[in-house]
Structure formats: C-alpha cells, structure tokens
Amino acid sequence: MRLRPLGIEGVWEITPEQRADPRGVFLDWYHVDRFAEAIGRPLRLAQANLSVSVRGVVRGIHFVDVPPGQAKYVTCVRGAVFDVVVDLRVGSPTYGCWEGTRLDDVSRRAVYLSEGIGHGFCAISDEATLCYLSSGTYDPATEHGVHPLDPELAIDWPTGTPLLSPRDQDALLLAEARDAGLLPTYATCQAVTVPSPAPGSVGDPGP
C-alpha cells in the first residue's frame, strides 16, 4: 500500500498492493498503521456507506460543518467513477480548487479527504458502487452542499448531461455558501486535524 499526497492539503491517494492468482485478487484497501504513519493520525471510523449510481450520475459537492467535521476514505468496488475533491476551507491556499481521480475496480485506488474538504463524484461506467468510510455519522443538520456545476469551480465532469438529485440541483453556489457563512475556515479545520508530513509517498513497495 502506498499513500501519496495530492495538491490539496489533507487529500491523499492510496494505491493498494494487489495479490492475484487463478482464484482472483486479494488486497488491503485500508491499513490503520500505514495510514496513521502517513497522515499523522488514525481514521476514526464512525460509519461506512455504499453508494450505487448509474452512468452519468453526479453526486456532490457535499461537506460537513467543522466542527464536528467529517473525514472520508473512498474507494470504488464496482465499475468506475471520476472522484472529485474541492477545497472549501476559507483562507486555505488552495481554496476553491478541485482535483479529480479515477477510482475503479481495476486499480482499486482510494482517496482520503480530511475535514473541510468537499466531495463528489461522477459514475463513468454503466453502474458504479462507491464504498466510503467516514469519521462521523450522517447528520442532516450539519451537512451541506455546493452546486457541482458551479462555473466558479469549473469542474470538468466527464459527462455531457449529468444526472443530479433535487438536493444537488438546488445547492448553493460556492460564493453563496461563503456569503451565508456555511463554509468552514482553514484555521478551524487545522485545529481539528494533525498536520500532514512533507509531500512524498509513504508505504512499503511490496514484494
């Protein structure tokens, strides 16, 4: 398993070591010790979710108040998605920036995002199943969304006509969410997280 920090602080890409033989494949997609060594703290598991989507579905951009905040560890166990993280932390050097990563059932990579980072994805296979571990339980009173098609974010979704839920369709734009005081601040998020080590890959290379 190798962990690589992405361009937004607090976001990591995890590449597992896959062991294949004629029977199939086995892998560790989460390892508490290697994760904590890279990130600087373990993931406090509070809830695990599965999301099944058909091609063209876009979900997001979702985020949780900080505090309490919610970190996520996301992988695709069937099909493929274009997974997107957005820095929603007001005052962050990368505020308003996004990064996209292909998650699928071939590479079986995962993405970790810390508190204050928005999350969304687009299903790019006929059906895609996303599995994610969360550090907090779902509470509709603390969860919010930014419109995934906000022109200020300019996310390059790999679909011509995205399928959105009514909730995501009615979500605020980034500027509206900021003006409404809904976005977390970088300082508040820093107070609830442990600083990450310097950029570089962490983990064993495998046999």
UniProtKB/Swiss-Prot annotation:
Gene Ontology terms for molecular function: dTDP-4-dehydrorhamnose 3,5-epimerase activity; isomerase activity
Q: One Pfam family, short name please?
A: dTDP_sugar_isom
Kindly report, in one word, the top-level EC class recorded for this enzyme: isomerase
- GO CC terms on record? cytosol
Alphabetical list of CDD domains matching this protein:
cupin_RmlC (cd00438)
Q: Which Gene3D superfamilies match?
A: Jelly Rolls
Report the EC number(s), separated by commas if there are several: 5.1.3.-
Q: Which UniProt keywords apply?
A: Antibiotic biosynthesis, Isomerase
The protein's matches in InterPro entries, at most eight in alphabetical order, are given as: RmlC-like, RmlC-like_jellyroll, RmlC_Cupin_sf
Record-marked site positions (Participates in a stacking interaction with the thymidine ring of dTDP-4-oxo-6-deoxyglucose): Y138
Superkingdom of the organism of origin: Bacteria
* Involved pathway(s): Antibiotic biosynthesis; novobiocin biosynthesis
Active-site residues annotated for this sequence: H62 (proton acceptor), Y132 (proton donor)
Range of residues in the leader sequence: none
Q: Detail which positions bind substrate.
A: R23, D28, Q47, A48, N49, R59, K72, H119, E143, R167
Q: Name one GO biological process term.
A: dTDP-rhamnose biosynthetic process
- State the family named in the UniProt similarity comment for this chain: Belongs to the dTDP-4-dehydrorhamnose 3,5-epimerase family.
Question: What does this protein's UniProt record list under function?
Answer: dTDP-6-deoxy-D-xylo-4-hexulose 3-epimerase that acts together with NovU to catalyze the formation of dTDP-4-keto-6-deoxy-5-C-methyl-L-lyxo-hexose from dTDP-4-keto-6-deoxy-D-glucose in the novobiocin biosynthesis pathway, an aminocoumarin family antibiotic that targets bacterial DNA gyrases.
Other comments on record: It is unclear whether NovW acts before or after C-methyltransferase NovU in the novobiocin biosynthesis pathway.
Name of the featured protein = dTDP-4-dehydrorhamnose 3-epimerase
What is the organism lineage in this UniProt record?
A: Bacteria, Bacillati, Actinomycetota, Actinomycetes, Kitasatosporales
